[in-house]
């Protein structure tokens, strides 16, 4: 596998007590879509900041296209395309001008920049809005324009920080299609996200991060099948879960082999051979004079993997 991006013991400390990224090791192959999945504060954005030269690492090293990110930041900027969380389009320019002047900034001639701009407007389905001010774009269109700008100079690696955050479901799906098209053209993509379905749908491999560390790495299917995260049993009674979760936790079978979490009136139980404990769960709840309102079993998801690794979900 030809390596497009490599991080070796990459670390960022803001103080002795605040370690944003802790000895991160990572290799991303050329043409791969790789995801960093984790909650806010996991270290994803800081990792992206170091890889894009915006944040100086405290220690460790990183290479993009074989170029040292710390020693040669100016050269690295020609190897990366970046789409940050915030809208960084020039509001004083039109859609077309945002692309054209980006090309000029990267050394394209007037004619080459104009030609590349026209190609990207077609590719990203923005031709009809070429003369529109960027302020008139919807969130999805603005994100497509930032993507088009980021790949203008054909970067080795495209780095996206929470690319669909704040988009409506339709715009999110449309952006997934655009990223899929870029990948089909051989573009290497690193994206950070806290959306499990996004990581599952887009990423060939992903790393689950929390508190600045990589907890697990693999394909989505590998993570779901190899980490022993098990299936999920969700049960809801006719009263708040606080009235019966302690009783469930007092059962030796449940407390030693399964992860239990209260979720409003329901309880989520994660573990292997989940169907074997259904009778124990229902009997325990009913012994408290309660009745079962809902019960369902679900196969492993990236969320259950994360919960099994951290004891909490991505939204906490």
Please provide the spans of the model-predicted regions.
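ABC transporter nucleotide-binding domain
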Residues: 177-272
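ABC transporter nucleotide-binding domains
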Residues: 2-5, 12-197, 201-210, 216
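Conserved protein kinase catalytic domain
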Residues: 77, 121, 224, 306-307
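Short beta->alpha junction loops/turns
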Residues: 69, 238, 270, 274, ...
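C-terminal coupling/interaction segments
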Residues: 273-316
């Amino acid at each position: 596998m030809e390596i497009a991006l490599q991080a070796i013991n990459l670390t960022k400390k803001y103080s002795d007590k605040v370690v944003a990224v802790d000895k991160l090791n990572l290799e991303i192959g050329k043409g791969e879509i790789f995801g960093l999945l984790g909650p806010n504060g996991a270290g994803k954005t800081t990792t992206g900041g170091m890889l894009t030269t915006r944040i100086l690492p405290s220690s460790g090293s990183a290479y993009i296209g074989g170029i040292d990110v710390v020693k040669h930041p100016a050269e690295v900027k020609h190897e990366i395309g970046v789409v940050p969380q915030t809208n960084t389009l020039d509001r004083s320019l039109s859609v077309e001008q945002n692309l054209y002047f980006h090309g000029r900034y990267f050394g394209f001639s007037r004619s080459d920049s104009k030609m590349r701009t026209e190609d990207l407007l077609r590719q990203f389905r923005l031709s009809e809005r070429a003369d529109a001010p960027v302020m008139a774009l919807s969130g999805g269109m603005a994100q497509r324009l930032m993507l088009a700008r980021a790949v203008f100079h054909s970067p080795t690696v495209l780095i996206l920080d929470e690319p669909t955050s704040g988009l409506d479901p339709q715009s999110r799906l449309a952006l997934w299609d655009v990223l899929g098209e870029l990948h089909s053209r051989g573009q290497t993509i690193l994206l950070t996200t806290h959306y499990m379905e996004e990581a599952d749908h887009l990423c060939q491999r992903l790393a689950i991060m929390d508190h600045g560390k990589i907890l697990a790495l693999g394909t989505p299917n590998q993570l779901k099948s190899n980490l022993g995260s098990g299936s999920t049993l969700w049960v809801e009674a006719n009263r708040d879960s606080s009235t019966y979760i302690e009783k469930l936790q007092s059962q030796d079978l449940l407390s030693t082999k399964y992860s239990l979490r209260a979720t409003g009136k329901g309880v989520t139980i994660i573990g292997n051979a989940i169907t074997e404990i259904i009778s124990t769960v229902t009997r325990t709840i009913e012994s408290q004079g309660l009745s079962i309102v809902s019960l369902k079993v679900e196969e492993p998801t990236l969320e259950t993997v994360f919960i099994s690794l951290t004891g909490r979900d991505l939204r906490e």
